[in-house]
Curated annotation (Swiss-Prot):
Subunit structure comment from the entry: Whole protein oligomerizes in native gels. Part of the ESX / type VII secretion system (T7SS), which is composed of cytosolic and membrane components. The ESX membrane complex is composed of EccB, EccC and EccD.
Domain notes: The cytoplasmic domain is a rigid structure with 4 domains (residues 480 to 599 form an unnamed domain) plus the 3 FtsK (ATPase) domains which are connected by short linkers.
Compartment(s): Cell membrane
GO-annotated molecular function: ATP binding; ATP hydrolysis activity; DNA binding
Location of the active site: 785
The protein's name in its UniProt record: ESX secretion system protein EccC
Bilayer topology: Multi-pass membrane protein
NCBIfam families: T7_EssCb_Firm (TIGR03928)
Source species taxonomy: Bacteria, Bacillati, Bacillota, Bacilli, Bacillales
Extracellular side: 257-259
Pfam families, sorted: FtsK_SpoIIIE (PF01580), FtsK_SpoIIIE_N (PF12538)
Topological domains annotated Cytoplasmic: 1-235, 281-1479
UniProt KW Electron transport keyword: no
Length: 1479
């Protein structure tokens, strides 16, 4: 590997050239190989290209060559006015290591006397106070870590000195490494750096057997010395005094009374006594002194032995404590040496998370006991005091490490902020040194102002959060919000674990809370400040005052000053243990952390297993197009083997999974916790099968219950037959999936029976020979997250396993994958799973569930897994291949991506690729490229993709297809789902055959929309002459738009009571008419009638939305509808109705609903009552329904029109109706139910309703039922009464009569107005004689009488000539607005004259119209009144019960007549009419 040197300004960059590198780019962007940010490169970036011969390098800028580089040569380039020098070593670099431990100076120059002779460098190295100092030469450039030196600088281990074509690095204080492209001549001793076993394996690190020294626990008993003997309590004088006294007495007696010999004897005796007593005393005194000295000597020797024994135990305890709890400064040194004590403690260690907080006098672990005896009965002498002193001294061990336990609960650290922060550094360093990042992780919460103090810790691997690149450093709101939530969820999951008391969670989290205010409002405090000792967390609270700490702190450490501290509380008890703080400095902290970060802790059998292997690496290729896919498809035969590689168990040792029934198969389990690589392993296996086997040999059906996206990369691959998913939460997931799978099994069984084979291998052999037409691949059913699937769909998993067991010979293989196997792998699943693959498991219990041992719980590397076949017939640990790796065709293999490392994780900067344009795009993954290659191979070989047994779930919205013609007699109303037939097709409503339709479902699930779809479909096929709609919209007006359809005869609302009554009458008449017509044609159905008759009858469809209202509020209407639904179908009258409850429709009507469309019911019993038990439920999706005719079919009803939302659908429905109106504009619309207008004026009445006026008929109003004009027939009934109370509209009736009379050009009209002169407007009319007085009335009567007499003569003559029927005269009319005024203004003679004229001239065109009160017509007995009573024609503007002129039927609770209405009475019969208003 040669090197490229780039020198500019005062900097130097070194780039190592590999054989794969073709083009090196020098620019100012991070993605460039060499980045020089201070240069603008306005003329283009510098490119260094290898020439084909490899002996020279071409230097280009902006695509133009500006020079060449030869080995050990350089070129200087002007870049935008700045100089840049590029040099190339041109040869492989060689490394030399020299021992310089005995040197005080090392000279590097071209001098033969120099320690290192070279022409490329000139500088010296001198040792000053144990540290090397580099002294550059002014004439020779020298760079330290890429920056040019101008003065002497102290060096540290690892600093790199650069000069042209050479590097100098102190790898140890006494070892100098020199890298050069030419041979180095040196007088120094060349050596190899001594490496410990750990350093040899660096950066791989594995724990070694731990040395554990036990603390002494001996029992040392110290016996007290024997009690010192009591001396003679009598002194010498007490012994001598008696005989002396006796001697003196005898002497005195002898002087007074001498006795001779007796006296002498007595004196001798007492003198002897004195002498012997004195001698005896002295001898005993000497013996006592000797015994005392012997006692002291013996006990002193005894104490010395005990002291030595206790001293040895004390030293042992001291050594053990200092060994197991070294200082943080010692640990820094250990780490640099890659000491075997790194990470020696495990979660099972007794001293797990025990840390040293300083030194103190601690109680001895050995026992010192003193035989106290009965001290109350003896004196304390110096020997006893010595024994007590020794026992006291050795009951404590002085100045040894004082540990505290931080393995559970919360501890508090109180003191000055700077002191506490420094001590936290030591605690963190100790924990990081002794505990692996597999076992312990840190989360520090501190103020952003202290970030510099905590920054070095981010390099510790323990601060990296599990399954993330983020650091456990929380110092502001952003880091808190982005990191703490995921940590909280992890703790919450642990807290909710029902077996948390029986397990140890890993990793153990140590929270360091130095700024509680940052998380004061966060929910994670419920775990940090409460007693949560069973979820694998510890908390260290740091504060300046103890009042800021939580009450659940079990240990409180107070720092008094920079040298002293005290354990105030320990294990929730007062302790007051003073201690001295350890001295430490921040120097070396970052190096310590970085060194630990570089170590890769391996656990278990992982020496030769790679940490990561991509799919293409496993396949031993770098390009997807180099995979031998075509050759594999042609050569690999499933009948022989299904073995495909899935990973490596060694560098070149491939692990294969073979699901052939004679090998590892046919079924198995895959388990792995979140982030373990389970889905990636399944994807690798699928991809490997697809690369090795033809799509007609192997196929997949992926069951991805929650739609996790595992199947997404394979969506277009020919091997993938479908993805069974329930991402929308369908109730029919399991039923549909099982139906699809069972249909596939039945299909295979049918083919086997047809070709008389019983195994898939035999069948495929027939297919390859051309004897069988359809290929049957091995079908792999892969169910991801089956634990959740089983918990929610237990019957499905049971049936799935059962189906797979049956399908063994049919070529069906089942792979179940889960995160949590505990409690979901029953005996049926276990007995059918021959192989099991377990990736990282959450705990030992989960591992035992899948492997029957706890090995998988110890896995730490993503993608690492155990393969177990049968009863450990195969048991291998391997690294599964990663198919999701970025695809790199050419380039530096180690530079897949460039990221900026932040505390929140990795932020990608760019993607490295040789193609500059591709580097700006998201790189494709290997799985994408391989799938593309598979698809391309399929196209090249023209391989047809096999049909899928699984059809996707029905979509939630489907637009109605284009209208079909009437001749089709079948209307698609929805998409029918039949997974048992592997089919999805239109559901057709057979015109006239499928009868009445009932649409049921809870509110809001598409009943009205379904009805609209049906009606629009029919309307598109049949014109308004062939099809009539009567729409009853009793719901939420959803059918209102259909009112505009040209087929809609009428539209009814709930409050249209009169119109509904008329509809009932209309339907009765229509049905009777149709029955009569059918009898005439001797047919029984509308289909036959229209086929035989020239006059076709239209189909009538009565659409009734919300039938529930009918039953509740319209019982009479319901009774009629039941009859119509029963009898109307054969007559061409059909009903479509909706209801929200089954009970809303009576059984007689329900039995006449041949087709039932059942939408979603909130109460599932409603569906059961309608159509019984069905294999599928209706999902709560608008438009989803079961259609029951003969069988129930799950269907998604089409929308009436296309549209993304309901508003767009409605707009398109309106457009469709406009289109239909234009199409059918020349066809008459069906007649609506006739209804009176809300207001009837005289002009509207005459222009709209009175279309033809016949002579002798006076239209006076509209019939309420038929809405046809009602007229007074003056030919049959020449006179008419207008009867009513005052102000009830009599005058208006008179006006209507006058207006109608005037149109007929009468001979004469005499008008007698009422008292209120309501007809005064007619006074000036030429053709009306307005009568104000009796005289004027008499005059008009005379004139009329003369005219009538002349007519009588003509009539008599005509009778004689037999032509009386041909006579016709214009009417002579006498109109009276008030009978009372007439009676008041005239006398009996005149009244009699009028009565006579009525009798004599009625047949000659004389007519009388009289208005008055009912009483006015009956109370009088004069001739006129009597004649008026004889009139049988009248218009009543009063209640029928309020008059007695006519015997008319009425009800007891007869309603008041509405203004503008009245009764037209003729011949004893009445009909209600609407009377026009004359303005």
């Amino acid at each position: 590997m040669s090197q490229l040197w780039v020198l500019y300004e005062t900097y130097c960059q070194l780039f190592s050239l590999t054989n794969e590198e073709k083009v090196i780019v020098i620019g100012n962007q991070l993605e460039h190989h060499v980045t020089v940010s201070s240069f603008s490169f306005r003329n283009g970036y510098i490119q260094i290209e290898k020439k084909s011969d490899g002996s020279t390098l071409a230097v280009l800028q902006g695509g133009r060559q500006i020079g060449e580089l030869k080995p050990r040569c350089s070129i200087t380039i002007d870049v935008d006015g700045q100089q840049m020098t590029i040099a190339w070593s041109g040869e492989e670099q060689r490394k030399y290591v020299y021992y310089v431990g005995q040197q005080s100076e090392v000279l590097v120059s071209n001098d033969p006397q120099a320690d290192i002779e070279t022409t490329n460098a000139r500088f010296s190295l001198r040792k000053h106070r144990g540290q090397w100092v580099v002294i550059p030469d002014d004439d020779a450039p020298l760079f330290l870590n890429g920056v040019q030196l101008s003065d002497a600088v102290s060096l540290r281990n690892g600093d790199v000195l650069l000069c042209p074509y050479m590097q100098f690095v102190f790898i140890e204080e006494d070892l100098l490494a020199v890298t050069s492209s030419e041979e180095v001549v040196s007088s120094l001793t060349e050596t190899m750096p001594p490496l410990s076993e750990m350093k040899k394996k660096y950066p791989m690190y594995r724990r070694t057997p731990r040395m554990i020294y036990e603390l002494p626990s001996d029992k040392v008993s110290i016996s007290f010395p024997s009690q010192e003997g009591d001396g003679d309590p009598r002194g010498l004088w007490l012994m001598v005094l008696p005989p002396v006294m006796m001697l003196l007495v005898i002497g005195a007696v002898a002087l007074i009374q001498p006795r001779g010999v007796f006296i002498m004897i007595s004196i001798a005796m007492f003198a002897t006594t004195i002498v012997t007593s004195t001698a005896q005393y002295m001898r005993e005194k000497k013996a006592r002194q000797m015994r005392k000295e012997k006692r002291r000597r013996i006990y002193t020797n005894y104490l010395e032995q005990k002291r030595e024994e206790l001293q040895a135990l004390s030293e042992k305890q001291r050594n053990v404590l200092y060994y197991h709890f070294p200082s943080f400064e010692q640990m820094k040194s250990f780490v640099m040496q890659v000491n075997s004590r790194i990470w020696e403690r495990t979660a099972e260690s007794a001293d797990f998370l025990h840390v040293r907080i300083g030194t103190a006098d601690v109680p001895a672990t050995y026992e010192v006991s003193v035989s106290m005896g009965d001290l109350a009965n003896r004196e304390i002498d110096d020997l006893l005091e010595q024994a007590q002193h020794i026992a006291k001294v050795y009951q404590t061990v002085k100045h040894v490490p004082l540990p505290i336990d931080v393995s559970h609960g919360a501890i508090g650290m109180v003191g000055k902020r700077s002191i506490v922060n420094g001590e936290i550094e030591q605690l963190v360093g100790q924990i990081a040194f002794f505990h692996s990042y597999h076992d312990v992780r840190f989360v520090a919460i501190f103020s952003e102002d202290d970030y510099k103090h905590w920054e070095w810790m981010k390099w510790l691997p323990h601060f990296q959060l599990p399954n993330s690149f983020a650091k456990g450093l929380i110092y502001n709101e952003q880091t808190r919000d982005q990191l703490l939530s995921s940590i909280y969820e992890m703790l919450r999951e642990r807290a909710l674990d029902e077996e948390k008391d029986k397990k140890r969670f890993s990793p153990h989290f140590v929270f360091i809370v130095a700024d509680r205010s940052l998380i004061a409002e966060h929910v994670i405090l419920e775990y940090l400040e409460e007693k949560n000792e069973d979820i694998g967390i510890s908390v260290i609270f740091a504060s300046e005052t103890k009042e800021s700490l939580t009450e659940n702190v079990h240990t409180l450490v107070q720092y008094i000053n920079e040298r002293e501290g005290e354990i105030v509380i320990q294990h929730r008890k007062a302790a007051h243990i003073p201690f001295q703080l350890d001295e430490h400095s921040t120097e070396g902290n970052e190096s310590f952390a970085r060194m630990l970060r570089s170590l890769n802790h391996q656990k278990g059998m992982s020496n030769s297993i790679p940490e990561k292997v991509t799919f293409l690496e496993m396949m031993q290729t770098r390009r997807a197009n180099e995979l031998q896919i075509v050759q594999n498809w042609l050569s690999c035969q499933t009948s022989r083997s299904l073995a495909v590689p899935i990973g490596l168990k060694g560098r070149n040792d491939v692990v294969e999974l073979n699901l052939h029934e004679k090998a590892h198969g046919p079924h198995g389990l895959v388990a792995g916790t979140t982030g373990s690589g389970k889905s990636e392993l399944l994807q690798t296996y699928i991809l490997s099968l697809a690369v090795h086997f033809h799509p007609h040999e192997v196929a997949f059906l992926i069951i991805d219950y929650k739609g996790g996206g595992m199947a997404q990369p394979f969506k277009n691959m020919p091997h993938l037959l479908g993805t069974i998913t329930n991402i929308h939460g369908s109730k029919n997931f399991s039923a549909r999936a099982l139906a699809s799978i069972n249909s596939e099994l039945k299909k295979r069984q049918r083919l086997f029976d047809r070709y008389e084979v019983n195994h898939i291998n035999d069948y495929m052999e027939l297919y390859k020979q051309g004897k069988a037409e359809q290929p049957l691949p091995h079908l792999f059913l892969i169910a991801d997250e089956f634990a959740e699937l089983k918990s929610e769909e237990p019957d499905f998993i049971r049936e799935l396993v059962s189906a797979a067991r049956i399908g063994r010979s049919l070529g069906v293989h089942l792979i179940l994958a889960t995160q949590k196997p505990r409690g979901v792998i029953d005996e049926q699943i276990w007995s059918n799973a021959r192989f099991r693959i377990s990736l990282k498991m959450q705990d030992v219990n989960d591992s035992k569930e899948i492997l029957r041992n706890g090995d998988a719980a110890a896995i730490t590397v993503p993608g690492r897994a155990y393969l177990q076949v049968g009863n450990n017939e195969v048991y291998e640990l391997f690294q599964s291949a990663w198919s999701g790796a970025p695809y790199v065709e050419e380039g530096v293999e180690a530079e897949d991506e460039i990221h900026i490392v932040t505390d929140l994780g990795l932020v990608p900067v760019s993607n490295v690729a040789t193609d500059r344009k591709r580097s700006r795009q998201k790189p494709k993954t290997e799985i994408e490229m391989v799938v593309e290659q598979i698809i391309e191979t399929q196209k090249q070989l023209n391989i047809e993709k096999l049909p899928s047994p699984w059809l996707p779930p029905l979509p939630p919205r489907l637009a109605r297809p284009a209208s079909v013609t009437a001749e089709a007699n079948a209307f698609p109303i929805g998409l029918k789902d039949e997974p048992e037939l592997q089919s999805q097709s239109d559901y057709f409503y057979q015109w006239l055959e499928d009868g009445n339709i009932g649409i049921f479902g809870s509110a809001g699930y598409g009943k009205s929309t379904t009805m609209m779809t049906l009606l629009l479909s029919f309307a598109g096929a049949y014109n308004p002459a062939q099809l009539h709609y009567y729409i009853f919209d009793f719901g939420n007006s959803a059918l209102l738009p259909l009112r505009q359809l040209p087929h809609t005869a009428d539209y009814f609302r709930l409050d249209d009571e009169k119109k509904i009554e008329k509809f009932i009458k209309f339907m009765k008449e229509e049905m009777e008419q149709r029955k009569q017509r059918f009898m005439e044609k001797e047919v029984s159905t509308i289909k036959l009638y229209n086929a035989l008759s020239e006059e076709k009858l239209p189909i009538i469809i009565v659409a009734l939305d919300n039938f529930d209202v009918v039953k509740e509020e319209m019982p009479d209407f319901e009774t009629q509808l039941i009859q119509y639904a029963r009898d109307g179908q054969s007559l061409g009258i059909f009903f479509i109705m909706t209801a929200t409850r089954v009970s809303g429709i009576r059984p007689p009507l329900m039995n006449n609903l041949k087709t039932k469309i059942v939408h979603y019911f909130i109460d599932s019993s409603e569906k059961f009552s309608l159509i019984g038990r069905t294999p599928y439920d209706v999902d709560p999706i608008p438009g989803r329904a079961l259609i029951k005719k003969d069988n129930a079919a799950l269907t998604q009803i089409y929308l009436p029109a296309d549209g993304e939302d309901d508003i767009e659908v409605l707009e398109n429905v309106k457009r469709e109706m406009e289109r239909l109106k234009e199409v059918y504009q020349h066809i008459p619309k069906p007649k609506p139910i006739p209804m009176l207008p809300p207001r009837l004026s005289m002009s509207v009445f005459t222009n709209t309703y009175v279309q033809h006026r016949a002579s002798g008929f006076i239209p006076v109003g509209l019939d309420e039922q038929t809405v046809r004009p009602v007229a007074i027939n003056m030919r049959t009934d020449p006179h008419c009464l207008i009867v009513g109370q005052s102000r009830k509209g009599k005058t208006n009736v008179v006006k209507v009569i006058l207006e109608s009379l005037l149109v007929q050009e009468p001979e004469s009209i005499g008008l007698l107005d009422g008292i209120d002169r309501g007809l005064a407007g007619y006074a000036n009319r030429d053709d009306i004689t307005y009568i104000e007085a009796k005289e004027r009335l008499a005059q008009w009567l005379n004139e009329a009488d003369a005219v009538l007499q002349q007519r009588e003569r003509e009539y008599i003559q005509a009778v004689n000539e037999n032509r009386a029927t041909t006579l016709a005269w214009p009417p002579v009319v006498f109109v009276v607005d008030s009978l009372l005024r007439l009676q008041q203004e005239t006398d009996s003679i005149m009244q009699g004259r009028i009565a006579n004229m009525m009798k004599q001239y009625s047949h000659l065109g004389f007519h009388v119209f009289v208005a008055g009160n009912a009483n006015e017509f009956v109370k009088g007995f004069d001739a006129l009144t009597a004649e008026l009573k004889q009139i049988r024609q009248a218009i009543l503007v009063t209640k029928k019960s309020e008059q007695s002129l006519f015997a008319l039927p009425f009800t007891r609770n007869e309603q008041e007549i509405e203004p503008g209405f009245g009764y037209f009475v003729v011949g004893g019969k009445d009909q209600k009419i609407q009377i026009p208003k004359v303005e």
